[in-house]
């Protein structure tokens, strides 16, 4: 980012619940103007590390001070109300709840991804599913703004009904 004229960034090392408790990590998050919740192999562990932690509270304070929260892949899924439980196909686990009543399906492509998202909506029928393909983002603004960015189309799934946004 510095090569493009952007400000200096830093990595906040939260890899487990212990990292989410450290005051220095929380201060870095609270002072941030942009928080990037990265992709990774295990959404459930990410959520468990952050849930009800000082780090999550620091992220909320940063957001209240106009920070942008960006979730990528598993990071985007974690921001939803519910996430896929990798250990049980017909079970959902609580997400971080930043997107109330939403289940995010990252890397959304093809019928398998659509079936997985619909299966989660069968378990949590009062939710909205957002299928986000690779190289595509969904921007949500504080005043209700919605923008699809990138070459793919975000798919919105209501229990049984699928609509491209």
Where are these regions (language model features)?
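Extended, subdomain-level signal for the structured scaffold at the beginning of enzyme domains
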Residues: 1-45, 128, 139-165
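C-terminal and late-domain segments of enzyme folds
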Residues: 34, 83-165
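Small-side-chain structural scaffolding
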Residues: 6, 32, 71-76, 80, ...
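A sequence-level detector of short, solvent-exposed, charge-rich linear segments
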Residues: 16, 48-54, 78, 123, ...
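Class I SAM-dependent methyltransferase SAM-binding "motif I" and its flanking Rossmann-like core
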Residues: 37, 41-115
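Structural motif
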Residues: 24-27, 61, 94, 122
